[in-house]
UniProtKB/Swiss-Prot annotation:
Keyword Cell cycle recorded: yes
Keywords, ordered alphabetically: Cell cycle, Cell division, Cell junction, Coiled coil, Cytoplasm, Cytoskeleton, Gap junction
Domain Calponin-homology (CH), first and last residues per copy: 995-1100
One Gene Ontology term, aspect cellular component: cytoplasm
Gene source species: Xenopus tropicalis (Western clawed frog)
Subunit details: May interact with both microtubules and actin cytoskeleton.
Cellular localisation: Cytoplasm, Cytoskeleton; Cytoplasm, Cytoskeleton, Spindle; Cell junction, Gap junction
Regions of compositional bias (Polar residues) in chain numbering: 29-48, 64-86
Identification of the protein by name: Cytospin-A
Residues covered by region (Disordered): 1-170, 280-366, 923-978
CDD domains given in the database record: CH_CYTSA (cd21256)
Length: 1101
């Protein structure tokens, strides 16, 4: 425990608030989740309140038990603190134990300080007056040895942890109850906001005036705007303070994410000590922090250090440190996003003067913050986000197309490389032949020189010998040609005869094959008949045997009949002589036997008759089959004999044809040998040499051409590959930055929505006042509206001139945004946000509910087709309700959105200044540009003079950004480029404007619709949802079909119907559904871009 008494001569001085922050950090961490839960639902409501309301609300949410406990602890801790400093060592366990109550009271008081400024000041004065009384003895008796025991039971530790956990539980319950209350209040406010919106809309429609009318009833709204501005500034201040405190905690080695598991770990920080000798040397105002390794100090050391810190600070009578401690204790309870719920103690220490200064500083910008402004700003940010997403999708689509084109170019390059290798091989072969023929020519010349034979070409041409040789050669060539033709005719005749013979042979073979098959078929039929005949014979034999058996049975039955007759006779004789009854029985039995025998005989007789009829029928069928078989056999034998004769004849003819064919082949071979001999004679060395020389010249020319083309292709391939890699890197960077911007925009949109909700809560007061003002001052308001309309018309007339000049200068000087300029603008946006916000103030003063100053567009631009028929610009009459329907100026648009706008047609007099990254023109376009165009792009200054409003109908000189795309540069001729443009009409447009095809088409649409009112084309979705953009685009080509002056953005169906009918009248098929376009606010940008592309293709290609 004595290691904290080390000398502090070289130790740096540490402010007292750091130690207080270290001791209270565990309590703030344990209550941080509850505080964050409270801060989020309450942030939107607290912004609408004043500073006093916020303080009262936060003070009312804390339980009253904490304040009672604080006062009790503070009154009981002073005797203990006086006794603690009586010993020689001020950091013994006894002094630390007596100061533990002081620490608890200090931490509880610090937690309540963040809620109420008045209670904080009273408590700080109390402790400042009482603690020096108890510490006066302690400082005088520093050198006296301490006699108290260092024993301290664990019951104090358990009691401290229980009291601390009880405080946290009570605080959490109170905060949860406040969260529920604030949630219910937020739901009620939402319902009131909806009701207020409907009442405000009805009131506007009843009054028939614009929101920009200024009346004495707008004073509460001005007060609301001032409060909103003050709250926003306090929010920024609290965020900066929170960030500073986090940095200080990190510098001290503490992390806000630490959550101790048990109460003992709450004090597991680095041990902080005080040197008693430094109090006597420096008057008790010097504080030290001795950090020895990472060994955690005891709880008593930490509490005694805090007591010494507070004592030294009370002696120096510095209230700023106490306020800083309170802010550091309370500040970790809130996050940077919800810092509005926690009142800033540093701003509280400044008091009323700081509030007055902040209100004075924000009074100049109070007129710009209103409900309509916030709504329009959110709308602009959403439009910017959708435009960015649409542009990224189009860029990825074109990236896939470029990858496919690159693959095709690579395959074409490989094919050209293979052809180059083939040509090089052919050239080498021809070179070898040329060298061979040159050696032969030299050898022939040497032979002629050796034999002293003149070989001059002129003499040979003139000599008769050369003429005779030439004539003989011509005769021989003619005879050879004639004989060759005759031989070819004979060969053709013989080949035809051979084909005919082969065909006849094939037919004969087919007939023989058919006859053989028929013969086999007949033989199979005869065999089948033979088998049936044998079966019939067997059946007949069976029937004969049956007949014989039946005949024997009949003879036996006849013998039995005779026997029975004899017996009957005997019976009659017996009957006549014997008993009559007995004889009668015998007769009946005999008669029954007789009947049975007769029935059996009749059945056998019938069976015999059936058997005889079957035998007769079988014999007849067998005879017929024998006759048919005999006739068929004779006919088959006759056909076989005839076919055999025909086969022999065909074989004989085939043998004759084969002999003739062999003879013809021999003749053909002989004729071919003669032809070859004539050819060998015909081919002379002079003709061969001349042919070879011509071929060598041609090949050399082809070689030079191919080498030149190969060099050009290699150079272009290297350039395109370098550009492609740069484009991929730029695109990846742009995608990453766009995602970051998107997330930041979403966060800002959420915050703005909360601010809007808070601002709209105050509109409830205005509803009743506006209703009363409607009944009492309707006539007065109408007169005021009339006067205000005249004033606005005068202001707009002044704006029309200045903004027209501004617009023309920005249109002619702004280069087309590329990927690099987009990236640089994103990088510079954050650093220039403050300067741009200061420069964005509009020069025209207006009321908080008045609309932002709009641009007055110049006269409508006249297309080249209309210049011969339209002499003057299109005049546009503007009314006050029309101004409220238009979109706001660029004064409230962030720098990122301003840079993403590809058109400058909607810039107002208060538009944001251009980012220097674009003005310097240091970016390089993704597509290739020529050096002259790049110099022209760089040489155009930002402040270049623009033409006046009177000459707006003439075409202004635009910055030439024409460039050749990678695919167009590969094609060698203009005809192939025309074919490519017909295949992809946007390729030429991308070369003309630079950048992607989507951006090029967007710039073309902006250029065509320049000067038309109510047109602001920034994307291919929401900018076209009212149909006016289609009508303006087609009006430049078909003015007779579209009465543009009669159109409004309210009647969408009529606008789309007129535009589609005008396009279909010239043959442009409509691919969009009118019902779908009228129903949706953001149509599919790909379908819409396809339709605009078809319009461009029809009128421009």
């Amino acid at each position: 425990m004595r290691k904290a008494s080390r000398s502090v001569g070289a130790a740096p001085k540490v402010p007292a608030n750091n130690k207080s922050q270290a001791t209270e950090r565990s309590k703030s961490e344990s209550s941080a989740p509850t505080a964050s839960k409270v801060s989020r639902p309450g942030s939107s409501l607290s912004k609408a309140k004043s500073n006093d309301d916020l303080l009262a609300g936060m003070a009312g949410g804390l339980p009253a038990s904490n304040s009672v406990k604080v006062k009790k602890n503070s009154t009981t801790s002073y005797p203990n603190s006086g006794t603690a400093m009586s010993g020689q060592e001020g950091r013994t366990r006894s002094s630390a134990g007596s100061s533990s109550n002081t620490k608890r009271s200090g931490s509880s008081g610090a937690k309540e300080v963040g809620s109420s400024r008045e209670r904080l000041r009273e408590r700080s004065r109390l402790t400042a007056n009482k603690k020096p009384q108890g510490l006066g003895v302690g400082t005088g008796e520093v050198s006296a040895p301490s006699k108290r025991s260092r024993g301290r039971t664990d019951s104090d530790m358990i009691r401290m942890s229980k009291s601390k956990s009880d405080n946290q539980i009570s605080d959490r319950a109170a905060l949860e109850a406040k969260v529920k209350e604030l949630m219910n209040l937020a739901k009620n406010k939402d319902a009131e906001i909806l009701l207020l919106r409907t009442e405000l809309r009805d009131t506007r429609s009843q009054l028939g005036q614009d929101v920009s009318d200024k009346s004495p009833d707008d004073l509460p709204l001005i007060h609301l705007q001032e409060q909103n501005t003050t709250v926003c500034e306090e929010l920024q201040q609290l965020k900066s303070e929170n960030r500073m405190l986090k940095d200080r905690l990190n510098a001290l080695g503490f992390s806000l994410g630490q959550q101790p598991d048990d109460p003992d770990k709450l004090y597991g920080f680095q041990s902080l000590g005080i040197n008693p000798g430094s109090h006597s040397d420096c008057g008790g105002g010097t504080l030290t922090s001795s950090v020895e390794g990472s060994a955690p100090g005891s709880m008593e050391d930490l509490l005694s250090q805090d007591e010494s810190t507070l004592t030294g600070e009370r002696r120096s009578s510095s209230m700023d440190n106490l306020d800083s401690e309170c802010s550091e204790v309370y500040q970790p309870l809130t996050s940077s996003d919800d810092a509005l719920d926690a009142p800033s103690s540093s701003s509280e220490s400044e008091g009323l003067p700081s509030t007055e200064r902040s209100r004075k500083g924000s009074s100049g910008n109070a007129s710009e913050v209103s409900v309509a402004c916030l709504t329009e700003r959110i709308h602009q940010m959403e439009e910017n986000q959708h435009s960015t997403a649409e542009e990224l999708q189009a860029t990825l689509q074109e990236l896939a197309d470029l990858q496919q084109i690159t693959q095709e170019l690579n395959s074409e390059n490989e094919r050209l490389g293979e052809e180059k290798v083939i040509l090089m091989d052919s050239l080498c072969q021809q070179s070898d032949k040329l060298e061979l023929f040159s050696r032969q020519l030299e050898y022939a010349q040497a032979l002629l020189d050796e034999h002293h034979i003149a070989y001059s070409l002129d003499e040979d041409l003139k000599s008769s010998r050369y003429l005779d040789l030439e004539q003989r050669y011509m005769d021989l060539a003619e005879n050879g040609r004639f004989e060759r033709e005759q031989l070819l005719g004979v060969q053709q005749h013989l080949s035809n005869s051979l084909k005919m013979a082969e065909q006849d042979n094939k037919d004969a073979q087919d007939v023989i094959r058919a006859l053989k098959e028929r013969n086999h078929h007949m033989e199979r039929i005869a065999e089948a008949e033979q088998l049936s005949k044998q079966a019939l014979a067997a059946t007949l034999e069976e029937y004969k045997a049956t007949l014989n058996s039946e005949q024997g049975e009949c003879a036996r039955l006849k013998a039995l009949l005779e026997q029975e007759k004899q017996r009957v006779a005997e019976l009659y004789s017996i009957h006549s002589s014997g008993d009559a009854s007995h004889i009668q029985n015998l007769l009946e039995s005999v008669r029954s036997d007789k009947e049975k025998a007769e029935s059996l005989a009749s059945s056998l007789q019938e069976e015999l008759l059936h058997a005889r009829t079957d035998v007769n029928r079988m014999q007849d069928a067998f005879g017929k089959l024998e006759d048919e078989y005999r006739a068929f056999r004779e006919e088959a034998q006759k056909q076989v004999s005839e076919l055999t004769l025909a086969l022999e004849k065909v074989r004989h003819e085939l043998e004759e044809k084969e002999t003739e064919l062999s003879d013809m082949k021999e003749t053909i071979f002989e004729l071919e040998d003669e032809v070859e001999q004539h050819r060998a004679v015909k081919l002379h060395d002079n003709l061969i040499i001349s042919d070879v020389e011509n071929a060598v010249k041609k090949l050399q020319d082809q070689k030079h051409d191919m080498e030149r083309e190969i060099k050009i292709l290699n150079r272009k391939l290297r350039e395109e590959s370098a550009e492609w890699r740069q484009f991929q890197a730029d695109l990846q960077t742009a995608v990453v930055i766009a995602n970051d911007i998107k997330s930041e925009a979403q966060e800002e949109i959420g915050e703005l929505k909360r601010q809007l909700q808070e601002a709209l809560e105050k509109n409830e007061k205005l509803a009743k006042e506006m209703e009363n003002a409607t009944s009492r001052k309707q006539e007065e308001e109408r007169g005021r509206v009339y006067n205000y309309m005249n004033a606005v018309e005068r202001d707009l007339a002044a704006l029309r001139q200045g903004m027209g000049l501004n617009r023309r200068s920005s249109t002619s000087s702004d280069p087309a945004p590329t990927v690099k300029t987009l990236i640089k603008s994103f990088d510079n946006a954050s650093s220039q946000a403050a300067a741009v916000a200061a420069a964005a103030a509009t020069p025209i003063s207006r009321t908080p509910l008045s609309p932002s100053p709009m641009k007055t567009p110049p006269a409508a631009a006249v297309s080249p087709m209309q210049r011969h028929s339209i002499s003057g610009p299109i005049s546009v009459a503007k009314s006050l309700p029309g101004l409220s329907e238009k979109r706001p100026s660029y004064a409230e648009i962030p720098v990122q959105e301003h840079m993403l706008r590809s058109s400058s047609s909607s810039r107002s007099a208060a538009s944001l200044p251009r980012v220097p990254a674009i003005d310097n023109a240091k970016s390089i376009s993704v597509s290739r540009r020529s050096s002259e165009e790049l110099k022209r792009d760089i040489s155009v200054p930002d402040g270049s003079s623009a033409p006046s409003l009177m000459v707006m109908t003439s075409p202004s000189p635009q910055l030439s950004l024409s460039s050749s795309s990678p695919t167009a540069s590969v094609t060698p001729t203009a005809r192939s480029r025309i074919r490519e443009e017909r295949k992809d009409p946007l390729a030429a447009l991308a070369r003309e404007y630079g950048g992607s095809k989507r951006n090029a088409l967007l710039k073309w649409c902006q250029k065509k619709t320049e000067g038309y009112p109510n047109i602001d084309i920034t994307n291919f979705s929401s900018s076209w949802n009212d149909g006016l953009a289609f009508c303006a685009l087609l009006h430049t080509y078909l003015p007779a079909h579209i009465p543009y002056q009669e159109l409004t953005n309210q009647d969408k169906r009529r606008n789309f119907t007129l535009a589609f009918q005008a396009a279909e009248s010239v043959g442009i098929k409509s691919t969009l559904d009118i019902n779908e376009m009228v129903r949706t606010e953001r149509p599919d940008w790909q379908c819409l871009m396809t339709y605009v592309t078809s319009i461009y293709k029809y009128f421009e290609t």
